[in-house]
């Protein structure tokens, strides 16, 4: 009999559930954490259980005796998502300094924890927590231990929020839709390399803050689904899902693909007061952001030079190493379809 393939389109992986790497995460009530993890690209499967108690067996009614933590077994494809990135998604939805309490749930069974089965994961976990500690006040209370005495939870608890869409959930599931772009994947080439790699216009725009002509640039009216990356480094910047026609003659976006991939500087050139937008790693001049965008899209207009961007079509994103961002492009298609049908 062949392996049963994971069918959830949000997971981005066709790895059999029995393959991949495994990590066990505790973060309060497991109903919400399980549903949240299932939304993350690269996760193959998530299931609820009880971890690191005193006994080899337990059930929901006996947790106060066995001291198990409500946990989620996460099977993930390391080719799609790293453990470090998975943990950063986990950190988004837990209070890391709270002891035995998450959301409205109080008790030892609701403690936070990361339980590993591969000893090599311990270093990754420790480094991730060290980075997290820099951004939070108070001592981190997330326990880190090798997995022991794990018990799969009762059928009633598995996929609880799928079976009960309006059921209790202390987690904001939308945080799984927030894009994390790894900065260490991208580097800025030397000026010598950039001069060879870029056209004269691309170099002048990105390095010397020039502006290309409106309506005479490559992407201002492009409607194909895909992703726009920094022409100098390849770092993802904008999704077609957030592109709209502002009539200004340059590509316009309601927001970057992640708030972390752009930087801002005051620009008082040309006797105007504007906010310049630069790429995070390449520090390339991209354009400017204005507050005259559509209110229903957040009210911002990122007016970006085509010369600062490289477009990668949806069909090529996987082979060019941007497969992890495909779900956000597809969500954009759905959003656009719904908008068109209701307006």
Curated annotation (Swiss-Prot):
Q: Which residues form the active site?
A: 29 (cysteine sulfenic acid (-soh) intermediate), 303 (nucleophile)
**Care to name a GO molecular-function term for this sequence?**
peptide-methionine (S)-S-oxide reductase activity
Gene Ontology BP, a term: protein repair
* Keyword line: Multifunctional enzyme, Oxidoreductase
Enzyme Commission number(s) from the entry: 1.8.4.11, 1.8.4.12
Chain intervals for the UniProt region annotation (Peptide methionine sulfoxide reductase A): 21-174
Please give the catalytic activity noted in the UniProt record: L-methionyl-[protein] + [thioredoxin]-disulfide + H2O = L-methionyl-(S)-S-oxide-[protein] + [thioredoxin]-dithiol; [thioredoxin]-disulfide + L-methionine + H2O = L-methionine (S)-S-oxide + [thioredoxin]-dithiol; L-methionyl-[protein] + [thioredoxin]-disulfide + H2O = L-methionyl-(R)-S-oxide-[protein] + [thioredoxin]-dithiol
Q: Report which superkingdom the organism of origin falls in.
A: Bacteria
Q: What is this protein called?
A: Peptide methionine sulfoxide reductase msrA/msrB
> What taxonomic classification does the UniProt entry list for its organism?
Bacteria, Bacillati, Bacillota, Bacilli, Lactobacillales
């Amino acid at each position: 009999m062949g392996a049963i393939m994971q069918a959830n389109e949000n997971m981005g992986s066709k790895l059999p559930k029995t393959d991949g790497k495994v990590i066990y995460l505790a973060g309060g009530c497991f109903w919400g954490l399980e549903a949240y993890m299932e939304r993350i690209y690269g996760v193959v499967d998530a299931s609820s259980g009880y971890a690191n108690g005193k006994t080899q067996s337990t059930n929901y009614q006996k947790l106060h005796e066995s001291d198990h933590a409500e946990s989620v077994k996460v099977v993930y494809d390391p080719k799609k998502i790293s453990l470090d990135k998975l943990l950063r998604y986990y950190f988004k939805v837990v209070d890391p300094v709270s002891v035995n309490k998450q959301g409205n749930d109080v008790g030892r069974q609701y403690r936070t924890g990361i339980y590993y089965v591969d000893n090599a994961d311990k270093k990754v976990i420790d480094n991730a927590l060290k980075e997290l500690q820099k951004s939070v006040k108070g001592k981190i209370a997330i326990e880190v231990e090798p997995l022991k005495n794990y018990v799969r939870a009762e059928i009633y608890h598995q996929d609880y929020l799928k079976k009960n869409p309006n059921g209790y959930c202390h987690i904001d599931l939308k945080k799984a839709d927030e894009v994390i772009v790894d900065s260490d994947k991208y580097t800025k080439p030397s000026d010598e390399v950039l001069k060879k790699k870029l056209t004269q216009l691309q170099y002048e725009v990105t390095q010397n803050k020039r502006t290309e002509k409106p309506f005479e640039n490559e992407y201002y009216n492009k409607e194909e689904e895909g992703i726009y990356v920094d022409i100098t480094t390849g770092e993802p910047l904008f999704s077609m899902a957030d592109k709209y026609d502002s009539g200004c003659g340059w590509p316009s976006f309601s927001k970057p693909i992640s708030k972390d991939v752009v930087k801002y500087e005051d620009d008082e050139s040309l006797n105007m007061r504007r906010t310049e937008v630069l790429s995070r790693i390449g520090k390339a001049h991209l354009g400017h952001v204005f507050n005259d965008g559509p209110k229903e899209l957040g009210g911002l207009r990122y007016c970006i030079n085509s010369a600062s961007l490289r477009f990668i079509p949806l069909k090529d994103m996987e082979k060019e190493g941007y497969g992890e961002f495909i779900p956000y492009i597809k969500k954009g298609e759905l959003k656009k379809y719904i908008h068109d049908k209701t307006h």
